[in-house]
């Protein structure tokens, strides 16, 4: 019997409205390709991180035409960013719809390695927090796309630049908030987002650099706003200036822009300003002098890298090199950079240090244990082939348990908590074993759960050898084994069969009080996991079975026992040979000469000799298929039924 669960999550459609069936069907096709629910959560979390990196690209859309002294926009960047943003938002909308009609009822466990899902829209809608739903909706609203595609081409586009900045900021915060539940789900299922310590450190460093890039993008757009403010202030100081906000657009700009704006806003460092009429650009002077505001659309990588470097440099320096003007907004922006740099740097160092320590603690323990094992093997002069097998087993056990001693951990728990934990880990698997499925008493199964112990075997390992005593009964949960016999068991040499999930090795422990001798050799073909029951555990189970359960266990034992199957095959073959023998004897009787025939003595002797010779030839021709009594193999002895010892007082 196979104990492995279904590859995909189980979907229960009870209680779902008919209108949701089509949506659910499409979602099942999308999610059907995912290995587990946890992998899907990781994918959605990665999409959220990518969305955080895409949104600041909207701030790089405005440009300054240095030849005509007017504002323009990067149309190529508009198309690319809108397409990517729409694709990611659509992906997340599918995720929102899916979780609105699904509810996770069984988180990932170390025993099952699976998550189960039940489709139940009403239950989920009642339990889902309204706050998270509102945050999800605000996060995926296509407001930036609407602004850059509709408002910017209009005449009031300079006003829409400030609107765009606040829209990006208002959606950026909900996008960060919506990542927290996903992050908690992933860490609860996997223990960490990244399994490798270097991947975890790189992830924390990436998040630190992401904030640097975000601050650089806001600095870029604020520099353009500062330039626009300077031109408008210069026009306000001149009586003959009649430029309006719309005249600063390149599609409406004329020759007056070039003549007036060419000398209206000189780029002077804040420390060198001596005249009060000179405009103070503050910390945005670097963006204006570097020319990143005036580059052509095809030079976008240059603009992006420079703004990223500015943000990384000032966050790392906590904003100490920033020289601001007396503008309140600029000073507030500098304060945010300083405080954010301090917090981000502290979080980065703390997370990296914590992640490396948590990841290396068990690795160090494994290395220390490996060194002790090597010293012991060298001290005891263990042969090289045994050393290699020991090393491979230690590595395999580490991969499966991550250094956690499961049995020691379970023994340290209180009795009620230990029983509940073991019942959750083992009960479903034990119920699928035919030998244990006959137990109707729930407490007896729970007692068996408390007694089983998990074991691991490498490939090509011997579970038990022929002629050796059987000391434990193995219940296979994963892997394949081969059971062979070198003796003439049941009249056949090298009798072989395969064992897999749900099969049992060592069922002879049910017979008698002494340890039985194994009649077969069991060897693993692949890496095998399972549970073992010791002889005392078998006696405990047998002593608590009633008469009907014992009879049912005997029938189940006959059905699944290899000895009983082999004996049944030989018994059927012997019965068939006996049937063929009787049929042949009847044919011979029909060929005899009828009595009462009048023949003389010579003819009688001649006929008798002829019939005797013909019968001898007939026996010789049919010897291979008729199975004569002398050539027929003996029927093996019937295997013994299970013997149950009486319960000890």
UniProtKB/Swiss-Prot annotation:
InterPro entries: cNMP-bd_dom, cNMP-bd_dom_sf, Ion_trans_dom, RmlC-like_jellyroll. Residues 545-560 are annotated as: Calmodulin-binding. It comes from the Eukaryota. GO terms for molecular function: calmodulin binding; cAMP binding; cGMP binding; monoatomic cation channel activity. It is found in: Cell membrane. It is a multi-pass membrane protein. A nucleoside 3',5'-cyclic phosphate binds at residues 436-559. The chain crosses the membrane at residues 44-64, 77-97, 129-149, 163-183, 201-221, 330-350. Pfam families: Ion_trans. GO terms for biological process: defense response; response to bacterium; response to fungus. Residues 65-76, 150-162, 222-329 are extracellular. SMART domains: cNMP (SM00100). Residues 638-649 have a biased composition (Basic and acidic residues). Gene3D superfamilies: 1.10.287.70, Helix hairpin bin, Jelly Rolls. CDD domains: CAP_ED. Keywords: Calmodulin-binding, cAMP, cAMP-binding, Cell membrane, cGMP, cGMP-binding, Ion channel, Ion transport, Ligand-gated ion channel, Membrane, Nucleotide-binding, Transmembrane, Transmembrane helix, Transport. Belongs to the cyclic nucleotide-gated cation channel (TC 1.A.1.5) family. Probable cyclic nucleotide-gated ion channel. PANTHER family: CYCLIC NUCLEOTIDE-GATED ION CHANNEL 12-RELATED, CYCLIC NUCLEOTIDE-GATED ION CHANNEL 15-RELATED-RELATED. The binding of calmodulin to the C-terminus might interfere with cyclic nucleotide binding and thus channel activation. This is Probable cyclic nucleotide-gated ion channel 12. It comes from Arabidopsis thaliana.
């Amino acid at each position: 019997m196979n104990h492995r669960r279904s590859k995909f999550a189980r979907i229960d459609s009870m209680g779902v409205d008919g209108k949701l069936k089509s949506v659910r069907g499409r979602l099942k096709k999308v999610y059907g390709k995912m290995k587990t629910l946890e992998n899907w959560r990781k994918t959605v979390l990665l999409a959220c991180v990518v969305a955080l990196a895409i949104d600041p690209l909207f701030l790089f859309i405005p440009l300054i035409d240095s030849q005509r002294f007017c504002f323009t926009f990067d149309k190529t960047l508009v198309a690319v960013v809108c397409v990517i943003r729409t694709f990611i938002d659509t992906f997340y909308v599918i995720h929102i719809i899916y979780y609105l009609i699904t509810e996770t009822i069984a988180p990932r466990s170390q025993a099952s390695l699976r998550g189960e899902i039940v489709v139940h829209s009403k239950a989920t809608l009642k339990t889902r927090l309204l706050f998270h739903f509102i945050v999800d909706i605000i996060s995926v609203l296509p407001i930036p796309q609407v602004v850059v595609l509709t408002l910017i081409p209009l005449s009031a586009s300079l006003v829409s630049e400030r609107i765009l900045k606040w829209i990006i900021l208002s959606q950026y915060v909900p996008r960060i908030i919506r990542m927290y539940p996903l992050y908690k789900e992933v860490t609860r299922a996997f223990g960490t987002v990244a399994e490798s310590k270097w991947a975890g450190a790189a992830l924390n460093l990436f998040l630190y650099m992401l904030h640097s890039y975000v601050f650089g993008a806001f600095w870029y757009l604020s520099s353009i706003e500062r330039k626009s403010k300077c031109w408008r202030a210069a026009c306000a100081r001149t009586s003959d200036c009649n430029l309006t906000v719309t005249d600063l657009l390149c599609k409406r700009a004329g020759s007056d822009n070039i003549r007036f704006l060419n000398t209206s806003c000189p780029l002077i460092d804040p420390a060198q300003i001596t005249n009060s009429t000179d405009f103070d650009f503050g910390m945005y002077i670097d963006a204006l002098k570097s020319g990143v505001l005036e580059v052509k659309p095809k030079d976008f990588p240059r603009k992006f890298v420079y703004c990223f470097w500015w943000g990384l440099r000032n966050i790392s320096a906590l904003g100490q090199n920033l020289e601001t003007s007396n503008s309140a907004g600029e000073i507030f922006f500098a304060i945010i950079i300083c405080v954010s740099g301090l917090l981000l740097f502290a979080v980065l160092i703390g997370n990296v240090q914590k992640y490396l320590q948590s990841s290396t603690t068990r690795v160090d323990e494994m290395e220390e244990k490996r060194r002790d094992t090597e010293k012991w093997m060298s001290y005891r002069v263990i042969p090289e082939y045994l050393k290699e097998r020991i090393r491979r087993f230690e590595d395999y056990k580490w991969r499966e348990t991550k250094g956690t001693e499961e049995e020691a951990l379970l023994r340290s728990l209180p009795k009620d908590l230990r029983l509940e934990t073991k019942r959750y880990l083992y009960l479903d698997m034990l119920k699928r074993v035919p030998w244990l499925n006959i137990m109707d008493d729930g407490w007896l199964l729970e007692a068996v759960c408390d007694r089983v112990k998990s074991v691991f075997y490498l490939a090509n390992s011997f579970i038990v050898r022929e002629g050796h005593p059987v000391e434990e009964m193995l219940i296979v949960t994963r892997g394949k084994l081969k059971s062979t016999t070198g003796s003439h068991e049941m009249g056949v040499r090298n009798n072989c069969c395969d064992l897999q999930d749900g099969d049992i090795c060592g069922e002879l422990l049910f017979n008698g009080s002494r340890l039985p001798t194994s009649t077969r050799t069991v060897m693993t073909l692949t890496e095998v996991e399972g549970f073992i029951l010791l002889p005392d555990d078998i006696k405990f189970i047998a002593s608590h079975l009633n008469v009907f359960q014992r009879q049912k266990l005997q029938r189940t034992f006959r059905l699944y026992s290899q000895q009983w199957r082999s004996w049944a095959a030989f018994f059927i073959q012997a019965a068939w040979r006996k049937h063929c023998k009787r049929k042949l004897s009847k044919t011979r009787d029909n060929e005899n000469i009828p009595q009462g025939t009048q023949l003389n003595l010579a003819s009688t002797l001649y006929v008798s000799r002829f019939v005797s010779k013909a019968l001898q030839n007939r026996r010789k021709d049919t010897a291979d298929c008729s199975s004569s009594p002398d050539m027929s193999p003996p029927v093996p002895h019937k295997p013994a039924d299970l013997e149950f010892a009486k319960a000890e007082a």
